[in-house]
């Protein structure tokens, strides 16, 4: 079963900038959670403020784009790579070497815990990626050695070196060409950190705070975090693209499910992210609200453990695929907000194969194939996610 999910956001009055966060020191709480701000209601937990250390969740989906920037970005309409912190780049050695030329006008955020003394430079990029890829780097094991996204790709094994050529030029050398390399650097998992901030924490012997008290170059910076309640983001006045229009964004974590819907309907939220599909009728019928949908880059699918018999047999996996009624799932689970996918890649991906075929629903054929393989009364254990985006 593979489903391409749509991104769902309900907007009351105005559009939001997305926002995300993790653990940072508590500040004095304002009497009013709004405090002249914009309230974005979303469900999720914050375990880290560093998207490199997360596999998914609030920091990746919402906060990373507010706190940090990457070398590259992906245009949301054309799905093509576009410059971000790197204003240009070169592909050399048939795709085994990548050279990035950095912008010279990018400032890090000035927070209660850090005041930068310089602009972004090559040292920050080298520090960021050496920490991820070099297992001997002094920062690699801080807050655990796991970098889930890059670990899952065994990415470090293909990175030979990350080095500074000059103050504004960084070069990545790979062990072999990789056509997907640039696309990985455009994910939020490749957010760029401050080497100067890391050096300050090292002098204080407080290295663990790098992932808990974030400092980035993004449009908003962390101002206040109340675990399980809200995250307050303050405008980064020195943002290189220009000062954000909103002085602050509040990410409301306090309610889930119908609680978030109630907050939207009573005006406590300006935006409700990822509403449950079962709530769409209510949202569509309310003239005060605007529901926006667009194809997502995410998918839901049934992943087989191919190390375990009989799932190591492709014929068994095909027989199981024949037994799944995708169209029924589209309506009963996703209420028409998803489409059956023919590939593990979403349609919006640059690598999507338009010739990929969708497995038909044919339970009789499924039973016959399993019987021919000598399999009856097959019992499988399923692990399923519990998040609202599952």
Regions found by a protein language model. Name each.
Residues 25-26, 281-293:
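Ligand-binding "clamshell"
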Residues 29, 44-62, 85, 112-116, ...:
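A structural "hinge/loop" feature
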Residues 35-44, 87, 97-101, 125-128, ...:
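Short, well-ordered beta-strand elements
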Residues 39-94, 130, 137, 215-217:
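N-terminal lobe/hinge region of extracytoplasmic solute-binding protein
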Residues 87-139, 171, 263:
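Aromatic- and charge-enriched surface segment that lines or borders ligand/interaction sites
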Residues 101, 124, 133-198:
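Surface-exposed binding/hinge segments that line
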Residues 205-211, 236-282, 293:
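Ligand-site clamp/hinge motif
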Residues 232-235, 312-390:
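Append "and occasionally in soluble cytosolic enzymes with long acidic Gly/Pro-rich linkers
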